[in-house]
A protein has these predicted regions:
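N-terminal pre-core extensions flanking Radical SAM catalytic domains
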Residues: 1-151, 167-169, 335-390
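Non-transmembrane alpha-helical segments in soluble domains
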Residues: 40, 65, 122, 165, ...
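Distinct, well-ordered alpha-helical segments
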Residues: 188-192, 215-223, 280-284
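Alpha-helical packing segments of well-folded alpha/beta enzyme cores
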Residues: 110, 160-163, 167, 190, ...
Length: 390
């Protein structure tokens, strides 16, 4: 049985700001190192070792509490639960932890972000993760202090490539996300590196917006053919107009066309459940099922002013009813049902500081609506009365 979370024993994550963290859900302030340090020194540094020992003794690192443990208490499925299930076969590695918390194995699973280049301006995102936000970020109050330039600390880092060469025998999994990975030079450079180094047995997983399958002179399909295991998790937050509203520059027809082109690689589409997406998530699941594609619901953990628990009780009741109909009409496997039920359970909870968070949500959303010439109440007429009273 895994104590705490398996990631500190197998995983190294380098984020968009050049910070190393336990995983992509951890705030930047809780990094375990930076790009200025040799990457080879991170996996067994003092912070990593302390976290391992804390987990082995039954403790919960403060940085993990909100992002995973609090979600679990409310019935949601956390990243910790997901990775423990996926990588449970590596649980034995915990038994070989030294007294000081260090381990002898190299990372098995890498998540290195090759920059914040992206063509979408999602409302639950920002300039820290999307270059498309740069132009307008100063017009949105919460983004004024964020960096507004392309950041890529790894594509041209000799330190990273030397380290990868050193640990290549250990690396079994690589996760690509963004920004938008299919628009990143580092992504294609890494694919070619794996090919040149006879490492095509590595399992590649993507979170992609599927807005384009062409970049410069690269042919991603020809590259993918050389790998044994490709798994795509295309991101789609809500159904049609709701997704297009919350993910500026998203086009449903393009998404579905490209989804069908890459269908053989698709593990599941991924929907982040939030104020913006939850109302039409049942329709999304049903439509994807008609295409013989599964949908995974990932509970949003930040920013908390987009949390779906902020939705009014009558809308929560309406969403519950829609899901009940869905569960009766659409054939779903046990994993899909569990995923849906956990999100419903999370939705039905109350949230602390509700009024404060709602005011933050409306203030932000009004600014983006003004910028995009869009209307929340026209897109979500069921929420119009509630929205106007915030």
């Amino acid at each position: 049985m895994i104590k705490g979370c398996i990631l500190p024993w197998i995983h190294l994550y380098g984020d968009l700001q050049g910070q190393y963290k336990l995983c992509c859900h951890i705030p930047t302030k809780d990094s375990v190192g930076t790009y200025k340090e040799p990457i080879s020194s991170i996996f067994n540094n003092e912070k990593y070792n302390k976290i391992r020992n804390q987990m082995l003794s039954g403790g919960v690192p403060k940085m993990c509490k909100k992002t995973c443990y609090d979600i679990e208490k409310l019935g949601g499925i956390s990243n910790r639960q997901q990775v423990n299930k996926r990588f449970g076969k590596f649980a034995k590695l915990q038994d070989f932890t030294s007294k000081d918390g260090s381990i002898s194995n190299d990372p098995i699973y890498l998540d290195i972000r090759f920059g914040n280049k992206c063509n979408f301006k999602c409302r639950i995102c920002g300039p820290f993760a999307s270059s498309a936000w740069f132009k307008d970020a100063n017009k949105i109050s919460v983004f004024k202090n964020y960096p507004k330039q392309l950041e890529d600390y790894y594509t041209d880092s000799q330190d990273f490539w030397d380290y990868l060469q050193k640990i290549k025998k250990s690396v079994k999994y690589f996760y690509f996300a963004g920004g938008e990975p299919l628009l990143m030079d580092g992504h294609y450079k890494l694919l070619q590196w794996f090919i040149d180094n006879n490492k095509t047995d590595v399992e590649l997983t993507y979170n992609t917006n599927l807005s384009t399958l062409k970049y410069k002179n690269y042919d991603v399909f020809e590259l993918w053919k050389k790998f044994e295991n490709i798994s795509l998790w295309p991101s789609v937050d809500g159904y049609k107009s709701h997704c297009q509203y919350s993910r500026t520059n998203f086009n449903w027809d393009i998404f579905e066309t490209n989804l069908l082109k890459v269908k053989k690689y698709v593990k599941t589409v991924s929907c982040t459940t939030s104020i913006y997406s939850m109302l039409t998530t049942p329709e999304l699941i049903a439509h994807m099922k008609s295409l013989n594609v599964s949908t995974y619901l990932s509970t949003l953990d930040t920013p908390d002013y987009f949390d779906m628990r902020l939705l009014p009780k009558n809308i929560k009741k309406h969403i519950n009813k829609k899901f009940n109909i869905l569960l009766k009409k659409i054939p779903l496997n046990d994993g899909e049902k569990e995923n849906i039920l956990s999100n419903i359970k999370y939705l039905n909870n109350n949230i602390e500081d509700e009024n404060t968070l709602l005011k933050k949500f409306k203030s932000y959303n009004e600014q983006v609506d003004h910028l995009n010439h869009t209307s929340f109440v026209k897109t979500y007429p069921e929420l119009a009365e509630w929205y106007e009273t915030i």
